[in-house]
């Protein structure tokens, strides 16, 4: 919303006066007020901008917005130009005067002029846009802007520096998390083929001094991650330096990557390696100094081992020299020089011994060693006695920046330097991954030999050849892996295997085993993850294994080299290694005992951590490559895939993920429909044959439903009339279905955009919501897809959206606003009752139908099942992540639960179910969404409160020029909402409703649903139910010429069809060069992505809610059900009839026919191609009229049956008749029974029978005319006249009638009544108008 400010500086009073122009240039009303800010905690005043609005006839606080827009922009441009001129004109010679002015500024007073009817909204200052020294004095036309001073004596506060809010998306590769419905889950999970990535983002305010390092430091603290492993990039993936000022970047979205993926640097590194000279022509440079801290710790550990293992006299001199070099406090550079000299000496010693025979305890002579790497953290291998290229590492060897230090003598051993992997360009080696099995098994990452120089997840592996060599005295195994590729050849890093690997489950090691017979290699590497959080945050990882990492290495058997997934395989590998230790010598017995104790401790710690399942426990698979290489074990994430393979993986991942979601949803709904049909057949008391025929029809409809989903639809079945809207994901058209003539709103979404934005689930959610039978929700009629687009055909509401209504009317009266607020609250609460949060409530998402009632649209941002998704939900996201990383989460959770059940006080504080994703329009977002505090369903009522302010005041309270300013206003909502100004022309009830809706989350109105609004005084004494039932005429009823009138849509484009980008041939076929005909360069995996179960037709609708309602309404014991149902329908149609009569248009919903044949003839005439669009509405009315007639006829039949049944039950309830009936049905002689009743032994019973015979029941009198009764009376001619009149005669007659009761009922029931019942059931259960029309 544009605002205008005239800022004048008064030199006499040294104050700033804001003159607000409201089309009265001659009058300036100023109310000066002095503001002292001696208290530093007081919030500094912010320059208030005026909001000018609306129409004068509505007394809106905002006036002439569109007219003032250009003037405001021109004024601001002039202001900035004057500031820039003053800034550039100042020089260093004016520093003294500038300082004097700065001192005088401390006593300035701020005088602000405001009007009582003008809303004041805090706005962020524009100081970052002008580069200006705070000590320089500005011109007379520029406002005085001073920065906040830390001194308590400062009298003039100033604005805080404007913060430009930016989003930083954290992409962290994590381990898999498997939980049930009651477990805590993170807000967003994206399931990949082999991993799960947790994506979250932070909204951070950027000022003129914020650098990339500040942001990374903040995120590392928030997420408990290592700062060195985080890298900042822009939205295009370009790396940003740490000292770069982020406000200079135009984009406001950044990416923070943990454990930078350098796959894109692989080819560059390989090309660089191919250009290098051979190893014999290179020189070995000293190690780099970027690992100074790690090098010192390794040297200290090496010193401890050298003091314990000084057994070899031949190596004592070198050992003492290395000890002295390490013990003396010297710089890292000098230590590297000495180590380099030690390596040269070792080469000379071994070259002199090359002619002597070698044994298992001696070192072999390698080729000439030179360095051909120019990056740090290289990987090396020791030479083999038999071959210069075969590796052999000494016992207890340690790889230390290019040197292998012998454990026995401490003498460095020359190593063959293999070509570096692309990951060697990494500045720092990664530590132990977070939440991996090794992080809970103890041991510091700095003390772990295997993880010190192991590269993670960046090695492409296709074909490998490996040679292994073992010795008797040094039982260490070193592995060299060579990549064989038609384009290049490269050696992978070498990794020694030690006993400490069993303590860490071989994490971070590449283990290969060669099969020389089949010329194949079996590659086994464990799943690896990014670096872990800081060491201080993981207290549960014990330090008992810190010294075991430097023990002597062993040679595992071939079976132990092939690792398997799961805990059992790891235990089996450790047992195999223990067996190999027995045959390797007695020198490793002590180490075996220590490792066994460490393994037992690790098992206990692993059992505590039982709520996570890691991906290394997933079943392995086998894959044979192009060169005959067998990949056994887990999927190698380091393998480089081609573009075609990546496309296929993405397509399969998206397809199967969505396929099974929709399949399970359909199966659940189908089960509910079958249960409803079975219940209906039982309650309707249908005979077996009729029930089977009726259920057969329902099963046929279910089959047609599935067949229509598979058949699909095409765009050429619709005729595009005009474009009525355009959004971020597609376009909205007004279209007509060619075969039925339905006027629909056709929403087209581009698949590539939807998939790129990860909005596939949102589209499915929107479709599911529109399928619900709800009067406030726009219904979905059709849905289909082609190769490039998704299409949703919905009901068309010709009244336009509510935004257009507000733009035309300006403001509404309280009575008009009350009507629309009641319908909006009903629409939102109906979604909440289904467990759905809309999250995007704004005027443009409410539309008006042809009668003027509210309909809710656009459910793309809705969210379902917050309670099921988040479970217990911690208070903040940080606590949730800490609980997941904590090793004692399960025990703490169980203690908290037990304390809660027992009524204890030490209960962890859990909040209500909340969500954390930030969605919605900026002006209508609640503070908890902007502040990322978690929200519930009441966030929709905050947005509705903003809409209510627009109805009554004509403007949005948080409106600003940029989204960043809008967010700042929302975060400072208590200062922004000037209630005395906003509510000065409103009633007390309306003002109270606004204050309660725009309130903090716990105290916000609507926490208990719509009942809170019904009890509010603004709605309490008004006709809420009448408005909901449609008995009150809306304040605005659209006046349209036809069903395709788009006069109420401001964005309608009726002339240029070339901009619609519509192809009747579905533009989705394959081209000659790839997907979509774009050639090989235009291949996109999302172009041909078919979303399963997306096709939908209203003719195949299987409404579950309608079936459940009918099952309840068809209660034959209550004869008033149908009359109540009919009266409700009449009440609902009363309002529509009154509107048509008042408008002078009878409409097309009123037709009366004398016979059914006339209706059928008229129906067939409407199906002709020349019929208008209104014929569909006429046919619908005919069906409803026929439905009412069937109801009335069937109701009369049921009433007769119920009356007859009631008479029979009353007749059988008489105690005397029950006694006589029991005697008669025993099979005794009728004459003897009558004589016994007439004897003197039972005078009371005879008198009772005679007295009861004097008043026979009316039912028997009415039935005396029946032939069955006459025949039964003739069968007893010998009875006396007195006994013929008693109830015994009546009971005999009733017995004869009951024997043939079923047959008489079937004969008397006419075929017409039976047909009416079948037709009524079919119409009630499935209102399938399309199939009826085709008939």
UniProtKB/Swiss-Prot annotation:
Chain residues that bind ATP: 724-732, 747
Region listing for Disordered, in residue ranges: 1-70, 85-158, 276-447, 462-603, 1239-1313
The Protein kinase domain, residue ranges: 718-1019
Biological process annotations from GO: centrosome cycle; intracellular signal transduction; mitotic cytokinesis
Biased composition (Basic and acidic residues): 567-581, 1287-1313
Segments of skewed composition (Basic residues): 55-70
Keyword tags: ATP-binding, Coiled coil, Kinase, Nucleotide-binding, Phosphoprotein, Serine/threonine-protein kinase, Transferase
Enzyme Commission number(s) of this protein: 2.7.11.1
Domain AGC-kinase C-terminal positions: 1020-1106
Biased composition (Low complexity): 27-41, 89-117, 133-153, 289-331, 345-368, 382-396, 412-424, 437-447, 462-484, 498-507, 540-566, 586-602, 1239-1284
Catalytic residue list: 840
Biased composition (Pro residues): 276-288
Any one GO molecular function term: protein serine kinase activity
Domain of life: Eukaryota
Compositionally biased tracts (Polar residues): 8-17, 118-132, 485-497, 508-528
Coiled-coil ranges (or none): 586-613, 1289-1325
PANTHER family in UniProt: CELL CYCLE PROTEIN KINASE DBF2-RELATED (PTHR24356:SF417), SERINE/THREONINE-PROTEIN KINASE (PTHR24356)
Sequence similarity: Belongs to the protein kinase superfamily. AGC Ser/Thr protein kinase family.
Protein name: Probable serine/threonine-protein kinase ndrC
